[in-house]
C-alpha cells in the first residue's frame, strides 16, 4: 500500500464524522484533496453540506467536485474542519503550511468547533522541526523580519537556515494573501508553544505554521491500520 492509499484511508475515516447540514472547513494539500474528492462523492449522492475552502486551489477542487461553498463572511462558525499536516507531535501540535496556505488554514480552523487532522503515519514525530517551519511575512522590511525570526528561534534553543521560498518561476513564492514565506529549517523545536508566541509578536510576520491547541483529533493511517488520537 502506497502513501496516497494511506492518505485516502485517513480521509475516508474523517468523512465518517460528517453529517447532513454541516458547515465544513476544507483543507489544502495532497491529503486534504482526498477528503474533498470523497466528500464530493457523498454530495453527489445526496449529502447536504456547505464548505469553506482554505485556498484558491481547494476552492477549484471543491467546485469541480460539486461541493457548495461559502465564506466566513457569510457564516460565523463551522462545525468541522478537515485538513492535513506536515508534522504532528504527541500533544497534537502541528507544523502546517508546506503548501503555502497556512494563514487561511489557521483562520478557518480557528473558526471551527472541531479540527480533524488527517495524515499518513510518517507525519507523526516525537518533536516538531524536521519539516521546515513556514513563516508568512510582509515583503517590506524582509531583512529586519528575518533577523527577528532568527532571534525568536534562538530564544527557544532552535537554529538553522532561513530560506525565502521560491515559486516555479524562480521568484519569491506569493501566497493567496499576497505575502511571502520564509521556511525555517530548524531540525528540532524544543518549545513549539513558546516559539509560536514569539513569532506572532514580530512586526512583519503575518502568520506562522505552528498550530498549537487547535487540532481536536488526528487520524493516522499506517500499514497496520488506522489510529485515532484525541487531544487530552
Swiss-Prot record:
Catalytic residues (positions): 105 (proton acceptor)
Claim: Oxidoreductase is one of the keywords in the record: no
Locate the residues binding substrate: 28-31, 83-86, 96-99, 123
Recorded GO terms, molecular function?
ribose-5-phosphate isomerase activity
Pathway(s) annotated for this protein in UniProt: Carbohydrate degradation; pentose phosphate pathway; D-ribose 5-phosphate from D-ribulose 5-phosphate (non-oxidative stage): step 1/1
Q: Which PANTHER family does UniProt cross-reference here?
A: RIBOSE-5-PHOSPHATE ISOMERASE 3, CHLOROPLASTIC-RELATED
- What is this protein called in UniProt? Ribose-5-phosphate isomerase A
Amino acid at each position: 500500500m502506497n502513501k496516497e492509499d494511506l492518505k485516502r484511508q485517513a480521509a475516508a475515516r474523517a468523512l465518517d464524522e460528517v453529517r447532513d447540514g454541516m458547515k465544513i472547513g476544507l483543507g489544502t494539500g495532497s491529503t486534504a484533496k482526498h477528503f474533498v474528492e470523497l466528500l464530493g462523492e457523498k454530495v453527489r449522492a445526496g449529502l447536504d453540506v456547505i464548505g469553506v475552502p482554505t485556498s484558491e486551489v481547494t476552492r477549484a477542487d471543491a467546485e469541480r467536485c460539486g461541493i457548495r461553498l461559502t465564506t466566513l463572511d457569510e457564516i460565523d462558525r463551522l462545525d468541522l474542519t478537515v485538513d492535513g499536516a506536515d508534522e504532528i507531535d504527541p500533544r497534537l501540535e502541528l507544523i502546517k503550511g508546506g503548501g503555502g496556505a497556512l494563514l487561511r488554514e489557521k483562520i478557518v480552523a480557528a473558526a471551527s468547533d472541531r479540527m480533524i487532522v488527517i495524515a499518513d503515519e510518517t507525519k507523526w514525530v516525537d518533536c516538531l522541526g524536521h519539516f521546515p517551519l513556514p513563516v508568512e511575512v510582509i515583503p517590506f522590511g524582509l531583512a529586519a523580519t528575518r533577523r527577528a525570526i532568527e532571534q525568536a528561534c534562538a530564544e527557544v534553543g532552535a537554529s538553522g537556515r532561513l530560506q525565502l521560498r521560491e515559486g516555479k518561476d524562480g521568484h519569491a513564492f506569493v501566497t493567496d494573501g499576497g505575502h511571502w514565506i520564509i521556511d525555517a529549517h530548524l531540525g528540532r523545536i524544543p518549545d513549539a508553544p513558546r516559539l509560536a508566541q514569539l513569532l506572532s509578536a514580530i512586526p512583519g510576520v503575518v502568520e506562522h505554521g505552528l498550530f498549537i491547541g487547535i487540532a481536536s483529533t488526528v487520524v493516522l493511517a499506517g500499514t497496520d491500520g488506522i489510529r485515532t488520537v484525541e487531544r487530552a
